[in-house]
C-alpha cells in the first residue's frame, strides 16, 4: 500500500512538468528565426477578423480579434478553448501559387484551424515554446492551390501576430 502511495506522489509531482512546453527560442522543433524577426517588427499591417487578404510569401499581419462568443468562425474549433472569455477570428487567404507545406506561426498562444474547400485541414506538425519574444507557436499544414481560411480561437488578447510561410 505504501508503494502505491509513493507512486501516486511521484506521478503527481512529475506529470505536470512533463506537460509543460519548453522554454526558449531554441526549443522549437524547427527554426522560426525569420518568423520571429517579422513578428517583432513594428510595421506589420493590421486586418480585422473576417478580412480577405492576398499574400506574397511570407505573409505577415496583426489580426484584430473579437470575443470568441462573437466570432463568426466557419467551423467549430477542433479544440474547445479553456475559457469562453478569450478571443477568436478568421481571415480568408487567396490561393497559394502552388500546393505544398505551409507554416502558420503565431506571436502568442492560440488554437489554429485551417479550412479549405469547406473542410478542416489536419495539421502535419506543430511546435511551441514559451519565453521567446514574438513567437509562441507554429503549425504546418499541407495546402492545395486554392483559397483557404485561417481561424483562431482561445487567444487571450484581442490582437495576434500571424505569419504564413512556405516550407
What kind of feature is each model-predicted range?
Residues 1-4:
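Positively charged n-region of N-terminal signal peptides that target proteins for export
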Residues 20-167:
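Acidic, Ser/Thr/Pro
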Amino acid at each position: 500500500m505504501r508503494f502505491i502511495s509513493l507512486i501516486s506522489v511521484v506521478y503527481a509531482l512529475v506529470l505536470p512538468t512533463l506537460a509543460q512546453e519548453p522554454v526558449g527560442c531554441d526549443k522549437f522543433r524547427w527554426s522560426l528565426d525569420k518568423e520571429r524577426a517579422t513578428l517583432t517588427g513594428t510595421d506589420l499591417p493590421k486586418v480585422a477578423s473576417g478580412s480577405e487578404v492576398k499574400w506574397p510569401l511570407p505573409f505577415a499581419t496583426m489580426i484584430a480579434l473579437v470575443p470568441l462568443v462573437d466570432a463568426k468562425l466557419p467551423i467549430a474549433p477542433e479544440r474547445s478553448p479553456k475559457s469562453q472569455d478569450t478571443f477568436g477570428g478568421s481571415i480568408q487567404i487567396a490561393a497559394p501559387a502552388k500546393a505544398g507545406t505551409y507554416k502558420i506561426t503565431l506571436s502568442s498562444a492560440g488554437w489554429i484551424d485551417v479550412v479549405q474547400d469547406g473542410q478542416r485541414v489536419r495539421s502535419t506538425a506543430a511546435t511551441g515554446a514559451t519565453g521567446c519574444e514574438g513567437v509562441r507557436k507554429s503549425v504546418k499544414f499541407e495546402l492545395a492551390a486554392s483559397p483557404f481560411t485561417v481561424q483562431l480561437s482561445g487567444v487571450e488578447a484581442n490582437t495576434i501576430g500571424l505569419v504564413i510561410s512556405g516550407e
